[in-house]
């Protein structure tokens, strides 16, 4: 018997290197999002043909079979409030993401951060991203997507920009460009991991 599709689903994924973040992530998530389904992908076993974060597009494709609208969150994202309203901002046929302002500033190009990705259905760019991570020489999933959408017109076709508060990265604090009401604080990198451990020990 076929399972009925959910209308909304939040997903994340981790492997043995990052699963220490999971308890902290879930504690914050469920504090603010009771009733909003969460699916966790085990990246130690899921999509064995891919490594690490390159599994992310595969997880999103799998989730598109489970729900009409999906939000991916990295496990180093601190969920500070309900994110249910984020589903209302999703645009069909696009990946909905926040601009990575620090990377854009430092590189001179427009980057979008792949730590938070929202979408409806199964956008064409999602399958293209999955195919590209299988053959890429780029160092991460975000770099792969950026290389695919570097051209302004291509980016306009496939990426829809979400408000800054839905993915405020650690370097935003350093650059002093944080939004007023942060919904998702993304503690990126080694220093971000240190901050997460500090919060877990409080």
Whereabouts are the PLM-identified features?
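Extracellular/periplasmic catalytic domains that process cell-envelope and extracellular macromolecules
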Residues: 3-5, 90, 108-111, 175-180, ...
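Residues that flank catalytic or metal-binding motifs in active/ligand-binding sites
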Residues: 6, 56, 73, 112-115, ...
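A residue-level signal for conserved active-site and pocket-lining positions in enzyme catalytic cores
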Residues: 10, 29, 60, 76, ...
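Lumenal/extracellular "mature" regions of secretory-pathway glycan-modifying transferases
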Residues: 24, 30, 36-56, 95-113, ...
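Non-transmembrane alpha-helical segments in soluble domains
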Residues: 26, 30, 84-87, 130, ...
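GT-A fold catalytic core of metal-dependent nucleotide-sugar glycosyltransferases
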Residues: 52-111, 118-119
């Amino acid at each position: 018997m076929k399972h009925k599709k959910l209308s909304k689903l939040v997903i994340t994924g981790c492997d043995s290197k990052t699963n220490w973040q999971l308890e902290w992530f879930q504690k914050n998530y469920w504090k603010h999002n009771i009733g909003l389904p969460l699916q966790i992908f085990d990246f130690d076993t899921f999509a064995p043909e891919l490594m690490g974060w390159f599994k992310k597009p595969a997880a999103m494709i799998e989730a598109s079979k489970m729900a009409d609208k999906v939000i991916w969150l990295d496990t180093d994202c601190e969920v500070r409030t309900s994110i249910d309203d984020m589903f209302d901002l999703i645009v069909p046929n696009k990946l909905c993401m926040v601009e990575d302002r620090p990377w854009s500033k430092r590189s001179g190009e427009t980057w979008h951060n792949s730590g938070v990705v929202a979408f409806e259905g199964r956008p064409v760019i999602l399958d293209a991203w999955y195919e590209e991570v299988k053959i890429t020489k780029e160092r991460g999933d975000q770099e792969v997507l950026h290389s695919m959408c570097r051209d302004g017109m291509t980016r306009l076709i496939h990426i829809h920009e979400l408000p800054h508060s839905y993915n405020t990265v650690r370097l935003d604090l350093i650059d002093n460009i944080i939004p007023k009401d942060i919904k998702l604080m993304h503690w990126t990198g080694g220093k971000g991991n240190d901050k997460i451990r500090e919060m877990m020990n409080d």
